[in-house]
Amino acid sequence: MQIFLKTEDEIDLMRKANQLVGATLAELGKHIKPGVTTLQLDKVAEEFIRDHGAIPTFKNFPNPFGEPFPASICTSINDVVVHGIPSEKSVLKEGDIISIDCGTLLEGFNGDSCYTFAVGEISSDVKQLLKVTKESLYLGIEQAIAGNHLGDIGYAIQNHCQCFGYGVVRELTGHGIGKEMHEDPPVRNYGSRGSGILLKEGMCLAIEPMITMGDRKIGLLPDKWSIVTRDRLPAAHYEHTIVVRKGKAEILSSFVEVEHLEGQNF
């Protein structure tokens, strides 16, 4: 395992890439409504990213089968946990939730973030799933400080979500991030206190709880990308890119613009 500690100059570049991801998610939030296709959302995202001088990192990113991802964002609706492929056949409906995962490459460094949006009015049960999943993200981030261990992050996420009876997906993880989208170490959403590698200042991590309303078991669809819950119950996914610091982690990505939109629309 090779972990690259980032310099302050490198972190500045990563901050720019992640700010663009946050702005892209906010731009997409303006378009999320019943009747919109996920392919339309993908076109909005790619144009926005390229207009800001960056590259959509996910486009042509290979899966374990060596097949390139065909779009600029992942659009995962309801029981799709991650890696949903945008399509003109995938039309948003009132009451859906959609997790949009977005990555950018800007000036040689990557940004990565995900947000689960409500499409119109959603049920109270699903609202709670989204709330708890987002809370677990920030509880995990609170543990991402120099001197703690990687397992402290996973424990905080797992403990919070399981208190509500939710499933914590284990086969999918967060990751280190920098010049490459996926770097060491893998950042699990489960674990025990004091386990795993020691966290050091300058580590950049993408922390991303993927939480299911029911059982944590997942399956792969025939498209070899979309990962779904086996029981077909909804899943939520939130992600921030952070820097490990002394005392308090620094969040490089942002939900501020997205949450402002949500306050207006939902």
Model regions: which residues?
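Active-site neighborhoods and metal-handling regions in enzymes and metal-associated proteins
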Residues: 1-266
